[in-house]
A protein has these predicted regions:
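Short, acidic/charged, Gly/Pro-enriched secondary-structure junctions
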Residues: 67-105
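N-terminal disorder-to-order initiation segments that are Gly/Lys/Arg-biased
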Residues: 1-62, 98-99, 106-123
């Protein structure tokens, strides 16, 4: 007998973190969205070169749901982050100065039976 799944083959039980997504909508216009059902993982890979140790950082963000709340160029902060209201705040809001802040480089929607079930973003 053929068994047909009615649910996505992915368990979203680990999507229990909060992230804040920031986007520059236009000159001087910034949006902030808090997502409470997310999986956010930092990855650090070290490679040894002839001149010393070289490190590379990356991240994976999984957001379940039927919408795509993040796009390339957005900034994502682990936890509930502060408001960013001015150009000066936005310019200072960079990964080198804010621990846990990353910039999205790619967004990949994932589908199950023709419907969006989650997105994976990273950089």
């Amino acid at each position: 007998m053929l068994s047909v799944r009615r649910r996505p083959p992915v368990d979203y039980g680990k999507c229990c973190q909060t992230v804040t997504i920031y986007r520059q909508e236009g000159p001087g216009q910034y949006s902030r969205q808090v997502c409470r059902q997310a999986f956010f993982e930092f990855r650090r890979r070290k490679e040894l070169s002839k001149t010393g140790s070289v490190g590379e950082s990356s991240f994976l963000l999984v957001l379940p749901g039927d919408s795509v709340p993040v796009r390339p160029g957005d900034k994502v902060l682990l936890g509930e982050g502060p408001e960013v209201n001015s150009r000066e705040d936005w310019a200072a809001f960079i990964p080198a100065k804010v621990p846990g802040l990353v910039v999205v480089e790619y967004v990949e929607p994932r589908y199950w039976q023709g419907k969006l079930c989650h997105i994976e973003a990273g950089g």
